């Protein structure tokens, strides 16, 4: 796995960034391995968490970006370029999950240890809900493949 992605999770943990990994990386942990050009992060949108994110960004090597504390994160628009052409896409809301609090999603998140780092991924049920709401061709394919692997229509 790309070291910069590991560093994201490592420094998010170290700086107490409240986040959930969603998108393609979450799809992969539920069994459907596909390539993805970005790492999608759902961020709890509080002042304290944004300060923690800013501090983590410095350690990751993305720089000290003061505007992190006030900027609007727009899915697929507000992203940060990582090494090897990967992008870090940060969002503060997820289509299809508007009726769920961040805490509810965090409490139901799947935690996977990767290189001794606890990494938080959106739980399977809510991943499927978000994928259905996004309804892009790749999301439809993800749902089909995940359902085959997990033998259910969740």
Predicted features, each with a name:
Residues 1-154:
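Compositionally biased terminal segments of proteins
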């Amino acid at each position: 796995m790309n070291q910069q992605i590991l560093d994201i999770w490592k420094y998010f943990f170290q700086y107490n960034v409240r986040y959930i990994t969603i998108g393609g990386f979450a799809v992969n942990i539920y069994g459907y391995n596909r390539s993805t050009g970005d790492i999608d992060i759902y961020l709890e949108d509080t002042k304290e968490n944004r300060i923690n994110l800013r501090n983590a960004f410095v350690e990751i090597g993305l720089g000290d970006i003061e505007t992190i504390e006030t900027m609007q994160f727009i899915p697929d628009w507000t992203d940060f370029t990582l090494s090897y052409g990967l992008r870090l896409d940060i969002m503060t809301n997820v289509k299809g999950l508007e009726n769920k609090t961040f805490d509810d999603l965090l409490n139901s998140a799947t935690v996977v240890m990767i290189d001794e780092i606890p990494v938080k991924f959106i739980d399977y049920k809510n991943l499927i809900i978000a994928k259905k709401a996004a309804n892009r061709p790749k999301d439809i394919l993800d749902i089909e493949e995940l359902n085959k692997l997990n033998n259910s229509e969740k």
